[in-house]
């Protein structure tokens, strides 16, 4: 009983603190709910399970393309309800995700959908440490694994550069140092060249003269706004066309 007394006193003290600060308690409850969901389905396999089940297999001659990524992919076309209108493109982005999470869901969210090509945009959240510290080598290994899985299933691969960030609106470069983004992009480009994959360079097209994401292309210094997606869309189309031609 004596051993339990300090624990009980601490719990009483915490209860008093939470009673005095209900907003903090609410945030804690939300965080616990988020953590519970993460622990029960860390790669978020459930996000697209129902949609995948409803999606019919590609028809004859259909050149389905899956976009695998994080929030930048997830938000693409969501505001206007249009994601490459008229094209058989499937959005499988999940906000906040890192490459190990994407690798775990690569089979149900890409391979099982029988696409002709996959566009992979990933790495910024790994650099930020969203799911824990990650070295560049670990990120590269996960990207390599996704590319190899795709090729083993006769899926053409488009590897995208990590997007630049900026501090013009909110501080973003502390968690995502530009030097790390440049280093990872250098590896992605070289890997794509060495393995005859298509490299999709969003980075260069969205960079200003300060080596930052152009202010007019973002609302928070990290995610593209409508103007940003307008820059990205034709680049993605060109890369997909190149991949499907096998060049």
Model-derived features: positions:
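Short, flexible loop segments at the rims of nucleotide/cofactor-binding pockets, characterized by
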Residues: 41-46, 94-98, 177
């Amino acid at each position: 009983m004596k051993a339990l007394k300090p624990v009980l006193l601490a719990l009483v003290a915490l209860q008093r603190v939470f009673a005095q600060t209900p907003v903090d308690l609410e945030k804690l409850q939300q965080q616990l709910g988020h953590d519970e969901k993460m622990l029960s389905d860390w790669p978020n396999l459930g996000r697209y399970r129902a949609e995948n089940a409803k999606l019919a297999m590609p028809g004859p001659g259909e050149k389905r393309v899956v976009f695998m990524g994080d929030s930048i992919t997830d938000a693409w076309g969501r505001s206007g309800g249009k994601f490459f209108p008229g094209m058989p493109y499937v959005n499988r982005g999940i906000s906040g995700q890192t490459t190990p999470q994407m690798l775990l869901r690569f089979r149900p969210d890409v391979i099982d959908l029988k696409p002709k090509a996959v566009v992979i945009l990933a790495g910024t959240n790994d650099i930020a440490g969203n799911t824990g510290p990650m070295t560049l080598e670990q990120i590269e290994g996960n990207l390599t694994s996704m590319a190899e899985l795709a090729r083993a299933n006769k899926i053409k691969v488009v590897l995208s550069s990590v997007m630049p960030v900026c501090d013009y609106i909110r501080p973003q470069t502390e968690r995502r140092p530009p030097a790390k983004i440049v280093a990872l992009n250098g590896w992605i480009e070289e890997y794509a060249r060495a393995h005859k994959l298509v490299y999709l360079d969003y980075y260069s097209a969205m960079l200003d003269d300060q080596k930052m994401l152009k202010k007019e292309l973002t609302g928070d210094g990290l995610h593209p706004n409508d103007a940003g997606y307008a820059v990205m869309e034709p680049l993605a189309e060109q890369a997909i066309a190149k991949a499907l031609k096998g060049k």
